[in-house]
């Protein structure tokens, strides 16, 4: 059995060294965008939970601060790589009534809960900005839910 010619002995290592950066780029890209999708699902579900708790028939209705607390509690699973973890920005409109006499007055009207979150990329943030002009780091993820009062 003949061995490899002397010129071919290091070819596999060189080929692997050439392809390794592309494989790592794909691997980390899949991981990074998986985390972005996870965070998007978290804020979408958080806005739904906030709206659902706000429109449920209770007397007195939840206040804006209580609805924001529901969204904040649901958002604790967000993944961030920033030095200081970003806090989601929560907007509730219209402002729920605060008096007991107005409990049923909003029946059928909509309550909007909006959540936005700034995701900082771990690896690809500034790299993608070179290739895509509309890409920004941090990436702002947002979700809005509208539900009618019961």
Language-model region placement:
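Absolute protein N-terminus
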Residues: 1-2, 150
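Alpha-helical assembly-interface signal, strongest on the long, hydrophobic N-terminal helix that forms
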Residues: 2-73
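Short, conserved structural patches
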Residues: 48-150
């Amino acid at each position: 059995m003949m061995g490899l010619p002397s010129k071919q002995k290091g070819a596999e290592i060189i080929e692997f060294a050439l392809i390794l950066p592309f494989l790592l780029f794909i691997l980390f890209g899949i991981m990074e965008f998986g985390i972005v999708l996870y965070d998007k699902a978290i804020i979408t579900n958080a806005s739904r939970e906030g709206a659902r708790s706000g429109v449920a028939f209770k007397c007195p209705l939840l206040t804006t601060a209580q609805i924001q607390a529901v969204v904040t509690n649901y958002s604790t699973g967000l993944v961030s790589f920033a030095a200081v973890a970003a806090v989601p920005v929560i907007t509730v409109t219209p402002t729920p009534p605060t008096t007991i006499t107005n409990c049923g007055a909003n029946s059928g009207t909509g309550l909007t809960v909006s959540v936005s979150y700034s995701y900082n990329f771990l690896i690809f943030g500034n790299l993608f900005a070179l290739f895509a002009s509309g890409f920004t780091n941090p990436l702002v993820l947002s979700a809005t839910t509208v539900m009618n009062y019961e």
